[in-house]
């Protein structure tokens, strides 16, 4: 159950490729994909594929005023940190932020939070939070790689 669904060497992106991955997740794990993230080149390739079929490109409004492409009501968002030629199909309900504690100020050896920077009329302090984003059901996610970018 720790291994996500992976398809490599996809080539040209299409709605069929995306739907096959979604169907596999639903049939094997009961996971409902609600967020798709990909590289900018993959997003352009997906737009190009939709335009080739003379279809209207569905755009949806996300929280915060952002707009995204849509695949069957699922937002398709590009991210600059996503590897080239890669698309992730995620169920965001399977992710949680786990933290050791809430935000806190680091104290020095003398118990002070605010410290003067040496030889300057400037003070500094450090605010920290030790947390990590954890996926509780990796098998409910999918990765498509080797997609030809536009």
Give short role names for the model-derived ranges.
Residues 28:
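Active-site nucleophile-His-acid catalytic modules used for acyl/amide transfer and hydrolysis
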Residues 1-23, 31, 47-150:
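Sequence/fold signature of self-assembling virion shell proteins
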Residues 33-42:
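Beta-edge loop/turn motif
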